[in-house]
Amino acid sequence: MPKPDIHPTWYPDAKVICNGEVVMTTGATQPEIHVDVWSGNHPFFTGTQKILDTEGRVDRFMKKYGMGTKKKGADSAKAESKA
């Protein structure tokens, strides 16, 4: 038997609300739960996700910070000047 007056009120039919629309009911300690995203409007679950061009972003970073591949002409010119 649980101790009296220490447990929250249980709502077996709590409404989950997204954008002003009831999307599902569940059990919770609050009568209404307001959410911004749920599986019905999340891009991953709806199949409308945008695929980023990660290769282009990496190349842009490498060029910006000088971590890209070195030119062969520059290496041979340095070697000739040292000799």
UniProtKB/Swiss-Prot annotation:
Function (record text): Binds the 23S rRNA.
Subunit structure: Part of the 50S ribosomal subunit.
Gene Ontology terms, MF aspect: rRNA binding; structural constituent of ribosome
Domain of life: Bacteria
GO biological-process terms attached to the record: translation
Homology family: Belongs to the bacterial ribosomal protein bL31 family. Type A subfamily.
Pfam families named in the record: Ribosomal_L31
Entry keyword set: Ribonucleoprotein, Ribosomal protein, RNA-binding, rRNA-binding
This protein's GO CC annotations: ribonucleoprotein complex; ribosome
Organism: Synechococcus sp. (strain CC9605)
InterPro entries the record matches: Ribosomal_bL28/bL31-like_sf (IPR034704), Ribosomal_bL31 (IPR002150), Ribosomal_bL31_A (IPR027491), Ribosomal_bL31_sf (IPR042105)
Keyword RNA-binding: yes
Protein's name according to its UniProt entry: Large ribosomal subunit protein bL31
HAMAP family: Ribosomal_bL31_1
